[in-house]
């Protein structure tokens, strides 16, 4: 389950995009519509702040779909109360990412420390390939 900061990194950088491309054939990359819209909201300012088109990326979030699938509210709303209870006051705006992870039993890929301690496996970019390279459970 991708957080908005991972979507931004995938759009503006190379490392996250490379990881997604490398594992796309065998992994499913999902994000709630709220994280997608949050990334869309912040990207123009980030592109402008950098004053250049970063490494050939144009800041266009839509270049990620596919391989990233955007989930609608009906997927994560049933787990919303559990997600809000777990993420608490840390960042209540992130509850949809956590709710998706809870509803679908997926880990979260983020750089945001607010997801740690929520009861869902949480991976940062520097460690996520360990997850992708683990042998599948029998």
Name every feature range the model reports, one short phrase each.
Residues 7-8, 37, 115-117:
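Short, active-site-adjacent cap segments at secondary-structure transitions
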Residues 14-18, 43-45, 123-124:
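Short, glycine/charged-enriched secondary-structure capping and boundary segments
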Residues 23-26, 33-82:
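PIN-domain endoribonuclease scaffold, especially VapC-family toxins
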Residues 30-32, 102-138:
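Acidic, PIN/NYN-like endoribonuclease modules and their adjacent C-terminal/linker elements
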Residues 58, 89, 129:
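Divalent-cation
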């Amino acid at each position: 389950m991708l957080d908005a900061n991972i979507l931004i990194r995938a759009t503006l950088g190379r490392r996250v995009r490379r990881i997604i491309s490398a594992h796309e054939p065998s992994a499913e990359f999902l994000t709630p519509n709220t994280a997608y819209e949050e990334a869309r909201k912040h990207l123009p300012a980030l592109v402008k702040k950098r004053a250049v088109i970063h490494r050939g990326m144009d800041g266009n979030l839509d270049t990620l779909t596919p391989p990233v699938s955007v989930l609608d509210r009906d997927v994560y709303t049933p787990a919303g109360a559990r997600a809000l209870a777990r993420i608490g006051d840390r960042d209540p705006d992130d509850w949809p990412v956590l709710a998706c992870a809870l509803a679908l039993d997926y880990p979260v890929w983020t750089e945001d420390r607010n997801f740690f301690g929520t009861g869902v496996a949480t991976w940062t970019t520097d460690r996520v390939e360990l997850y992708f390279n683990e042998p599948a459970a029998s």
